Amino acid sequence: KRRPAIAFVHLLLPPGGEPHASPAGWIGSLDRARDTLESLRIPTIVSSASPGNAEDLNELSEMDPEVLITTSPLLYAAACDVAKRSPNTVFFACTDETVHDNMSGFQARTYEAHYLAGLIAGALSEDGVIGYLANDPYQSKASRLRNANAFTLGAQKSKAAIRVLYAPGNDPDEELKTLIAAGADIVDLERALPSLVERLREHSVRYVGT
């Protein structure tokens, strides 16, 4: 039996799905890449795994793919565990954390979009105070800080005296209230959830985000 060349492992989505897993989004882009590989007669397989569950990945690694790609930062821990036990497979993990001998990392350049968001927020802010809510659970801590720093640099490029308030996203609803109470007139939302957007509208606070 021919050894699979490349295995793609997506995050197992909760019931009802995940709006960011749209055909035009991150997973859709990876699926198009897989389609291209198939068109070149490079055999691939695709699967999904639960966060932190190494057994899901271990079952796939037992098929002995040449390359195994995990497409979510939430699969990083499981990928690390399985990579140590699968020396004949090359792993690519969606992470900016520590990698290993047979594991490399890749990450989207989300900070570029947040820099542009900062340029806009800094230019449009009337009160000189804006906020950043790091509420995307799919981002690592390092990615969140990098995105927030890029947002701040963009805002300062537009308005040198701008104040940027940072909220780590541990309790998005309460932290958003705090940002509003502190005078932020524009907030960058890593995830523009309907409940957060509605609260901003109630207080006539603008936002940027996805």
Residue ranges of model-derived segments:
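Flexible loop/hinge segments that line or gate small-molecule binding clefts
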Residues: 84-107
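Short, well-structured alpha-helical segments in soluble
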Residues: 52-64, 171-183
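An alpha-beta-alpha
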Residues: 117-162
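Second-shell loop/turn segments in exported
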Residues: 17-24, 65-66, 102-108, 134-142, ...
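Short beta-strand elements in bilobed, periplasmic/extracellular small-molecule ligand-binding domains
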Residues: 38-49, 157-170
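Periplasmic-binding protein-like
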Residues: 65-73, 92-94, 182-193, 206-210
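Extracytoplasmic "Venus flytrap"
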Residues: 2-37, 46-51, 140-144
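Short acidic, glycine/proline-enriched helix-loop-strand junctions
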Residues: 85-89, 146, 150-153, 163-165, ...
